[in-house]
Amino acid sequence: MATINNNYLKLKAGYLFPEISRRVNAFAEANPDAKIIRLGIGDVTEPLPEACRTAMIKAVEDMGDRNTFKGYGPEQGYAWLREKIAAQDFQARGANIDASEIFISDGSKCDTGNILEIFGHDNLIAVTDPVYPVYVDTNVMVGNTGDANDKGEFEGLVYLPITADNNFTAEIPSKKVDLIYLCFPNNPTGATATKEYLKAWVDYAKANNSIIFFDAAYEAYITDPSIPHSIYEIEGAREVAIEFRSFSKNAGFTGTRCALTVVPKTLTGKAADGSDVELWKLWNRRQSTKFNGVSYIVQRGAEAVYSEEGQAQIKGLVSFYLENAKIIREKLTAAGLSVYGGVNAPYVWVKTPNGLSSWEFFDKLLQTVNVVGTPGSGFGAAGEGYFRISAFNSRENVEEAMKRITKKFKV
């Protein structure tokens, strides 16, 4: 009889967002007239930028002409896209990243999970708490953890609490860890990291031969010029960090699918015989074997992000969502709630009122004002008693949701 990967049985019954959908769908079925406003899953609502749409239409026409038709593309991504990314996203900020070190993919969610395939199972792994669930669940799936305790914490992971007491920036561990997940601007708390803070992590990683997985999916929302957009703006990061980025939240590619991972050629890991191995070569081998590349049409759309028109249009999109975040933050603060994030990030992190648990607040919001958010406990034990509200929605819906919430839950 065929056996299964028993690690999957360690996972919680439902991934956070499908569980939210299940509850919302059940409520909607029982209350068909309810006008539900969804501020939960971080999915964008505004259309693709015109520059991207125009480029993709042209790319479709290319595919209809024998002279410009494209078949299989390079697994790493077309050079014309990688070169623009290297120049505008990294080199323009003083980060010494070459186009050859960039890998185009169909999503940073996929990459943050797949990257584990090039690392051994004997690494000690650190995650923040609360944390984007994908980081934890993918480690469980590949066998890097033991079982979960009553709080949902898995044996074999080092949890680094991020709370209001430490400004939602995890303290560097006193013991040695091998792989470290950092996400800034942070999902779910909306916190940001200073250069000094990231430098401390880079120094720690260098001293301990550790690797940092740096998720910069929300870097476009940084408006403070003192906050770094990339970990490679920090001296020495090329030797210790892999960075993940996405076109989902800046250009609205959640349904179009395009992202990138940066693996510097100066980054190495240890083989079983103690020798140093270039991680770039391992990731390139993995991608060449298991991935056929992002479609030509989508990559042309992503390339248009770097045009003058594209840059102006994505800045407009980001500004729109940041204004939504500002409205959420200000309205909830005025209602007496404790509110964090939402300044250089599209997420607002709210302390639940009146001692309610995260899921109790979720159910109360859904049932009494028909607004959906994300329970903080779904991101980890330290998220209990908090709630994430997303700025990804129409202005009308955001304003209406705040009107409903503040009327019902004014402290």
From Swiss-Prot:
EC number(s) on file: 2.6.1.83
Cofactor or coenzyme needed: pyridoxal 5'-phosphate
Annotated source species: Nostoc punctiforme (strain ATCC 29133 / PCC 73102)
UniProt cross-references to NCBIfam families, sorted A to Z: DAPAT_plant
Protein's recorded name: LL-diaminopimelate aminotransferase
GO biological process, one term: lysine biosynthetic process via diaminopimelate, diaminopimelate-aminotransferase pathway
Residues that coordinate or bind pyridoxal 5'-phosphate: 72, 108-109, 132, 187, 218, 246-248, 257, 292
Keywords on record: Aminotransferase, Pyridoxal phosphate, Transferase
Subunit structure: Homodimer.
EC class of the enzyme, as a word: transferase
Gene: dapL
Pathway: Amino-acid biosynthesis; L-lysine biosynthesis via DAP pathway; LL-2,6-diaminopimelate from (S)-tetrahydrodipicolinate (aminotransferase route): step 1/1
